[in-house]
Amino acid sequence: MGKIGIFGGTFDPPHYGHLIMANEVLDALQLSQIWFLPNRIPPHKQNEQVTRSEDRLRMLELAVAGHPRFHIETIELEREGPSYTYDTIRQLTAMHPDDEFYFIIGADMVEYLPNWHRIDELIELVTFVGVKRPGFSMETPYPVIEVEVPQFAISSSLIRERVQNGQTIRYLVPEGVRLYIEEKGLYGARTSVADCERAADGTSLRAYAWRCRDGC
């Protein structure tokens, strides 16, 4: 029997905060693996614009590359409609009846558990793991394992905002993710890597690399 941590999110984009949280829970609970679960349409974000699934999946692949116990489960991307956790966990437990699942959520989500879709049935299928965050209560009528992780003020919205403002995101996201964002011009990135390469056109590599450090 495997102990599998499920870490759901839009990962728009994935960043080091996600990876640290996942790795700390993996270690604290001695889990076999962490499965990152990118959402197709999160119920609480149905009215928000979300980056294409293909781009979010590729960034997540780049983010987790090289970690032997980090994997990606695309079940929600393949399913139409809102991504309800109950539907996903029910499907996963049917597909992997010998595994034990732990669903990882941030402290900001713990207080909303009473509002989750079919929560009373869901807690019979999965163990919730709440990651503590300053300023958020972990009080809930539902059973939640609490895990402490190092605190970093990084969020996907912060990353998107910095990209839109032309600020560097180096060391906030894995390098492969940063380069992908630039290459694809995601989040309003002003200059893509491909643009830099085309614009160089005869300029010495060293001089142009200096000008292009985090965007031309």
Swiss-Prot record:
HAMAP family per record: NaMN_adenylyltr
Reactions listed under catalytic activity: nicotinate beta-D-ribonucleotide + ATP + H(+) = deamido-NAD(+) + diphosphate
High-level lineage: Bacteria, Bacillati, Bacillota, Bacilli, Bacillales
SUPFAM superfamilies to which the protein is assigned, alphabetical: Nucleotidylyl transferase
Pathway: Cofactor biosynthesis; NAD(+) biosynthesis; deamido-NAD(+) from nicotinate D-ribonucleotide: step 1/1
Family listed: Belongs to the NadD family.
NCBIfam families, sorted: cyt_tran_rel, nicotinate (nicotinamide) nucleotide adenylyltransferase, PRK00071.1-3, PRK00071.1-4
Keyword terms: ATP-binding, NAD, Nucleotide-binding, Nucleotidyltransferase, Pyridine nucleotide biosynthesis, Transferase
UniProt-listed InterPro entries: Cyt_trans-like (IPR004821), NadD/NMNAT (IPR005248), Rossmann-like_a/b/a_fold (IPR014729)
Task of the protein: Catalyzes the reversible adenylation of nicotinate mononucleotide (NaMN) to nicotinic acid adenine dinucleotide (NaAD).
CDD domains: NMNAT (cd02165)
Pfam families: CTP_transf_like
Protein transport is among the record's keywords: no
GO MF assignments: ATP binding; nicotinate-nucleotide adenylyltransferase activity
Name of the protein in its database record: Probable nicotinate-nucleotide adenylyltransferase
GO BP annotation list: NAD biosynthetic process
Enzyme Commission number(s) of this protein: 2.7.7.18
